[in-house]
Amino acid sequence: MPTSRPRGIHQGAAAEARAAAHLESLGREIVRRNYRIPGGEIDLVSREPGGTLVFTEVRQRRQARYGSALDSVTPRKLALMHRAALEYLTRECGRDDLPCRLEVLTIEGEADTGELRLLAVEG
């Protein structure tokens, strides 16, 4: 008997796939998807042609009823992103002083057709 996955999981996977394709169109190489540590996750880790690692949180909202996709990125989520990025650098790269940055990629509307925005995370 086939099992069905909740719509949110399908939407999340579709949003992350579209985000990865967009980052690749910018010349980046996707080096990791869904990097998890206890209490945190980075949706996409990519490398720019110049070598900078970019840690991307993907957020998608089909409807604005509960706020925008960007509104769903809380200070707590940003702190967890920082922690996960530092863990990635030390564990996967062996050092924490590599050029890197955090960003949020939002999709407003359906995952495959909604408006896409890429925003740098300050700090």
From Swiss-Prot:
Domain of life: Bacteria
Molecular function terms from GO: nucleic acid binding
InterPro entries attached to this UniProt entry: Restrct_endonuc-II-like, tRNA_endonuc-like_dom_sf, UPF0102_YraN-like
Protein family according to the UniProt entry: Belongs to the UPF0102 family.
HAMAP family in UniProt: UPF0102
Xref: NCBIfam families: PRK12497.1-3, YraN family protein
Protein name (record): UPF0102 protein DR_2282
